[in-house]
């Protein structure tokens, strides 16, 4: 249903607090890896934090924050510091062209795919930067985005470089080797979803999904499977 509201009805959800914090850390990470691709070191911690906080402050007044601006800003500072000291230190970009790589391709079934890879490392690993508010179990073998990128680029190793805003902030690099079984499973999902979209059949999220809720879905109030169904 999110696809229907976003791309058929063209109702674009506004940037929220969590998205802003993620965007801010992501921008700093991109800047850091661009510098690191040329000097092998990257940005200093202070410069990394300043870039993330600057991005946050630039957009904060346009966003309906879930906490005060000062608290949101402090969170960005804390998480960007953690990201820089872990992923920023340990991950090495393949080249300057391996940051924010635009991909255009398909899964071999005439379903076009356009996307952006945050980072491709020197040891051929596709990395997606994530900022999360909760520590959730992640199964990358079922990640449609990253498995699709793996298929298009012929790079088998995928990863999520995440920082999690828990009481004690955590940094994790979750790595997975993509198998033919994963590619086949994701291809089948894409085939089913694209076929349904062409037939204008828009299904709800799986029952019990955390993202199908008032807290996490912008379309909750207008979705027939959201508030009106309760």
Question: What would you call each of these model-derived segments?
Answer:
Residues 7, 128-131, 162:
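Residue-level recognition of conserved beta-strand positions in structured domain cores
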Residues 1-13, 54-60, 125-126, 191-202:
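Short amphipathic alpha-helical segments and their helix-coil junctions
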Residues 11-19, 134-140, 207:
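Short, charged/polar micro-motifs that form catalytic or ligand-binding hotspots
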Residues 100-152:
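Non-catalytic protein-protein interaction segments used by genome-maintenance enzymes to assemble
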Residues 1-37, 219:
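Nuclease catalytic cores
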Residues 28-103:
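A non-catalytic, helix-rich entry segment at domain boundaries
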Residues 17, 21, 68, 72, ...:
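Hydrophobic (often cysteine-bearing) scaffold residues that line and stabilize catalytic clefts
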Residues 43-53, 61, 72, 76-80, ...:
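Metal-dependent nuclease catalytic regions and adjoining charged, substrate-binding loops involved
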């Amino acid at each position: 249903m999110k696809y229907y509201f976003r791309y058929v009805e063209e109702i674009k959800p506004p940037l929220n607090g969590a998205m802003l914090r993620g965007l801010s850390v992501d921008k700093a990470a991109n800047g850091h890896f661009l510098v690191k691709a040329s000097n092998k070191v990257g940005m200093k911690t202070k410069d990394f934090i300043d870039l993330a906080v600057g991005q946050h402050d630039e957009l904060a007044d346009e966003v309906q924050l879930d906490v005060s601006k000062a608290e949101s800003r402090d969170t960005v500072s804390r998480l960007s510091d953690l990201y820089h000291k872990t992923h920023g230190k340990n991950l090495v970009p393949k080249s300057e062209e391996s940051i924010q790589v635009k991909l255009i391709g398909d899964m071999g079934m005439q379903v076009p795919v356009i996307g952006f890879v945050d980072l491709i490392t020197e040891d051929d690993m596709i990395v997606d930067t994530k900022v999360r508010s909760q520590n959730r179990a992640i199964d990358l073998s079922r990640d449609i985005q990253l498995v699709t990128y793996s298929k298009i680029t012929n790079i088998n190793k995928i990863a999520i470089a995440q920082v999690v805003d828990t009481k004690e902030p955590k940094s994790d690099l979750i790595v997975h080797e993509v198998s033919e079984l994963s590619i086949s499973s994701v291809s089948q999902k894409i085939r089913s979803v694209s076929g349904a979209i062409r037939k204008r059949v828009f299904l709800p999220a799986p029952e019990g999904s955390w993202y199908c809720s008032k807290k996490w879905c912008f379309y909750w109030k207008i979705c027939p499977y959201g508030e009106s169904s309760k």
